[in-house]
Amino acid sequence: MSTRNDVHLGHKAKKRFGQNFLNDPYVIDGIVSAINPLPGQNLVEIGPGLGAITEPVGREIDKFTVIELDRDLAARLRTHPELGSKLTIYEGDAMRFDFTQLIQEGNKLRIFGNLPYNISTPLMFHLFEFHKDIQDMHFMLQKEVVNRLAAGPGTKAYGRLTVMAQYYCKVMPVLEVPPTAFVPPPKVDSAVVRLVPYEVLPFPAKNLKWLDRVCREGFNQRRKTVRNCFKALLTKEQLEALGVNPSHRPENLTLEQFVIMANWLNDNYQAESTESA
């Protein structure tokens, strides 16, 4: 048996795919309990890997979908004695995947996975595009990313990812996971988070490009005051009229305030609103 710490169940972890395989039964049980898979639901796993979560989920339901980039792992799943007949396997990159092809009428997507940490943030931004068709998402992520997703205004972790995630979803941390739960162990702590897209957005933006732009401009200069961050777009008087304190820092602004600024800019800078952020 190999003594390498990057080999698990005969498969060598591929660094280019950011592979860290979960192998702690207690953690796996906690994740599956949080997902609570039920027969008939439209479940989708991103990056099933060697099946640590896939297998116990498969014991609860008859059919579900997996998306796997690593062709060797996809091949293993196709010939898996228990899972093979239950899985619809898409071999490819989840960041380019069109999740609308998995939509079933009256049966929203339930997406879960142990995401490669090197792509987790852009992948979540991709998934937010399908928020109307998603019931919930459960992801293993870097603990620092979960902290950012769940952060509140006025904290160091609060940033663009926070605002955009909370624009679309309720964010609920589920459990923390140590490096020892993986093969090979990552260099950081991990955590599981539940993201539940809103049926009705609490603070809808008229143009998401403006919301993204005010977030980028604010958080790229987070030590500056709001007045200085947005001086090219909004005057002190305009900020005050919108209920935004010009002397605050961007990290003190709420999601609602970012949306209010974005909507004002959309209404008053129609020509600019089509520009890419």
Swiss-Prot record:
Keyword match S-adenosyl-L-methionine: yes
MF terms in GO: 16S rRNA (adenine(1518)-N(6)/adenine(1519)-N(6))-dimethyltransferase activity; RNA binding
SMART domains: rADc (SM00650)
Sorted UniProt keywords: Cytoplasm, Methyltransferase, RNA-binding, rRNA processing, S-adenosyl-L-methionine, Transferase
Pfam families: RrnaAD
Superkingdom, natural source: Bacteria
Catalytic activity: adenosine(1518)/adenosine(1519) in 16S rRNA + 4 S-adenosyl-L-methionine = N(6)-dimethyladenosine(1518)/N(6)-dimethyladenosine(1519) in 16S rRNA + 4 S-adenosyl-L-homocysteine + 4 H(+)
This enzyme's EC code(s): 2.1.1.182
Any one Gene Ontology cellular component term annotated for this protein: cytosol
Main EC class the enzyme belongs to: transferase
Gene3D superfamilies xrefs: Ribosomal RNA adenine dimethylase-like, domain 2, Vaccinia Virus protein VP39
Cell location: Cytoplasm
Cystine residue pairs: none
Binding, S-adenosyl-L-methionine: N20, L22, G47, E68, D93, N114
Major place of residence: cytoplasm
InterPro entries recorded: KsgA/Erm, rRNA_Ade_diMease-like_C, rRNA_Ade_Mease_Trfase_CS, rRNA_Ade_methylase_Trfase_N, rRNA_adenine_dimethylase, SAM-dependent_MTases_sf
The keyword Nucleotide-binding is annotated on this UniProt entry: no
HAMAP family: 16SrRNA_methyltr_A (MF_00607)
Recorded family membership: Belongs to the class I-like SAM-binding methyltransferase superfamily. rRNA adenine N(6)-methyltransferase family. RsmA subfamily.
Function: Specifically dimethylates two adjacent adenosines (A1518 and A1519) in the loop of a conserved hairpin near the 3'-end of 16S rRNA in the 30S particle. May play a critical role in biogenesis of 30S subunits.
Protein name, entry field: Ribosomal RNA small subunit methyltransferase A
